[in-house]
């Protein structure tokens, strides 16, 4: 059996970590990673997450730093949080890796206060959900 693993994270602040996790999953026998980079942009990406790709997954692996990331124009919830919420709704197993409070964020990636507050609340919710 091959387990399909959906990799979820913001990309600007965690690009290197995301790539390392992808390589690790891809190198395991019996595991097939799914990530946005492999299925490319779609018309629905501007409005929300790719639920079809999430439904194909057996497991969600999430990486959480301190950046909230982007969201669709009509919804303030980030794509990463939407992916997490969809996995929760589907009762999909989740492995969430949450960066420590002192994990560095480069100055050029520091988000506005409203996004930082959303990310902080999202991080707390994920840690409580374990």
Residue ranges and their predicted role:
Residues 100-130:
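C-terminal interaction surface of TIR/SEFIR-family domains
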Residues 16, 70-71, 103-108:
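Switch/connector loops and helix/strand junctions flanking conserved nucleotide-binding motifs
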Residues 1-63, 88-90:
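Conserved N-terminal substructure of TIR/SEFIR domains
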Residues 41-42, 46, 67-89:
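Conserved TIR/SEFIR loop-to-helix hotspot centered on a Trp-containing motif
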Residues 21, 50, 80-83, 118, ...:
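A general structural detector for well-ordered alpha-helical segments in enzyme core domains, enriched
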Residues 89-102:
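A short helix->loop->beta-strand "cap" motif at the edges of active sites that frequently abuts
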């Amino acid at each position: 059996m091959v387990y399909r693993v959906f990799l979820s994270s913001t990309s600007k602040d965690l690009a290197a970590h995301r790539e390392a996790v992808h390589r690790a999953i891809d190198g395991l026998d019996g595991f097939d990673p799914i990530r946005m980079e492999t299925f490319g942009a779609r018309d629905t990406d501007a409005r929300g997450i790719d639920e079809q790709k999430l439904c194909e997954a057996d497991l969600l692996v999430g990486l959480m730093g301190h950046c909230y990331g982007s969201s669709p124009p009509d919804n303030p919830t980030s794509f990463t949080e939407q992916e997490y919420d969809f996995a929760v709704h589907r009762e999909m197993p989740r492995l969430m890796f949450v960066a420590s409070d002192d994990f560095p964020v480069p100055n050029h990636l520091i988000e506005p206060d409203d996004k930082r507050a959303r990310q902080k609340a999202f991080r707390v919710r994920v840690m409580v959900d374990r």
